[in-house]
């Protein structure tokens, strides 16, 4: 599965399915934006777990910039591999916003054989 590729490096940032949509760490004590961004990407990739190629395409996209609020602001999907295009194009503005930049995606893609 996709998460086996990430291994223990991101294990502490993966949120269980019971708390999907919540950060793995307290917002009041939030870590640097890069860690928040990685957590948001992992949550977003959870919706692509049914399609590894879909997840790789998400990481590969050079124009991708996700905006995550304190709750990551990710839309719920009914089935694996389905994405809401609005999540990729809309900015979610909040005091605890973390933007997944191209450099963050580049770092994340180093864990996936693309």
Swiss-Prot record:
Species assigned in the record: Saccharomyces cerevisiae (strain ATCC 204508 / S288c) (Baker's yeast)
Domain of life the protein comes from: Eukaryota
GO BP, one annotated term: vacuole fusion, non-autophagic
Name the UniProt record assigns to this protein: Vacuolar morphogenesis protein 10
Keywords: Membrane, Vacuole
The keyword Membrane is annotated on this UniProt entry: yes
Compartment annotation: Vacuole membrane
Principal subcellular localisation of the protein: membrane
GO CC, alphabetical: fungal-type vacuole membrane
Membrane topology, from the record: Peripheral membrane protein
Role of this protein: Required for vacuolar fusion. Involved in the early steps of the fusion pathway.
């Amino acid at each position: 599965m996709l998460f086996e590729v990430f291994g223990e490096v991101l294990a502490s940032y993966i949120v269980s399915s019971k708390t999907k949509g919540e950060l793995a760490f307290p917002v009041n004590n939030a870590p640097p934006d890069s860690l928040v961004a990685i957590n948001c990407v992992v949550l977003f990739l959870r919706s692509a777990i049914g399609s590894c190629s879909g997840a790789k395409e998400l990481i590969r996209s050079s124009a991708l910039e996700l905006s995550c609020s304190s709750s990551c602001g990710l839309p719920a999907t009914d089935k694996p591999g389905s994405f809401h295009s609005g999540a990729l194009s809309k900015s979610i503005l909040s005091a605890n916003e973390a933007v997944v930049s191209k450099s963050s995606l580049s770092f994340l893609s180093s864990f996936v054989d693309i």
